[in-house]
Amino acid sequence: METSSNHKLRYLLPGVTDVSLTDTLNSKPSINNGNPATRNPQHATRNTNSATRNPQHATRNPEFCYAVDLGRIDYKAAWKLQTDIVSARVKGIIDTDIILFLEHPAVFTLGRRGGRDHLLVSEEFLKTSGIPIVQVERGGHITFHGPGQLVAYPIVNLKAHRIGVVDFVAALEDIMLATVQTWGITAERNSANRGIWVGNNKLGSIGLAIRKGISFHGLALNVNIDLKPFSWIQPCGLEGVWMTSMQQELGRELPMNDVCTVVKEQFESVLDLNLTATSFSHLQQQLQNPNQRPPAEHGV
């Protein structure tokens, strides 16, 4: 990890995982296009239970956490909302974990480790295409966000959960792995780059920033996203890496709401959370009136 002495931010960099790059690139996982409920028995013994990942969870009730569905929202607007929530959490104005679920209009973002040298087309071309480039403080390289990609930004107090950054990243991978398994897609980790992969094709990405124990930014799962803009960059800063989507692996479009529902269920299971829906307007009210707790709406 890198540390910014000015802002006390810790940024995630790739680490060693349990799958070697050679094994990942040479494997050809089978794809089950049948019943979405079908699970791959190869993963039946996989540990995605937070009670076994962290034994302290076995005797604790699930942590209360707000789930906010933002729909399709401009990247900079969502980024500002995240930093506002993180600031409120650091100051003690908000004491509850919050996860933002959303999609972005087309945008390229540059992480701490990825610059414009990984852009394979001219910036003039991107301007003509109407796609902005935004530099952010998350870990990782250049990436693309767009409609059809499910993004989750968990703004979580890692210290309160007694979970380290490496385990938290592994948990986000578990969430995506279990989600795509629901539709019979076998994905796996890659020791060269965090996220989830189908062979040499990346299906889900992770980029985090941590400020005083509070996480922000998060995961991006390619569901029905247009993959063409990914060909205009070197994803993850790696040559010969391609992106894939659940739609491409299955040969059919998926309802985003269904995928989002499963992702929420996996957040609850993996991180031992009790997600309760609240609205964007209620969240804004709490940021403006810190003594007012946003009302819980119907379940997620």
Could you describe each region identified by the protein language model?
Residues 1-28, 32-33, 60-197, 202-203, ...:
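N-terminal lobe of the biotin/lipoate ligase/transferase fold
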Residues 2-3, 15, 228-300:
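C-terminal accessory segment of soluble enzyme catalytic cores
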Residues 26-28, 35-63:
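Arg/Gly-rich low-complexity intrinsically disordered repeat tracts
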Residues 41, 55, 143, 212-214:
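Short glycine/serine/proline-enriched coil/turn segments at secondary-structure junctions
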Residues 148, 215, 259:
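Catalytic-loop motifs flanking and including active-site residues across diverse enzymes
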Residues 198-252:
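Catalytic cores of processing enzymes, dominated by hydrolases/peptidases
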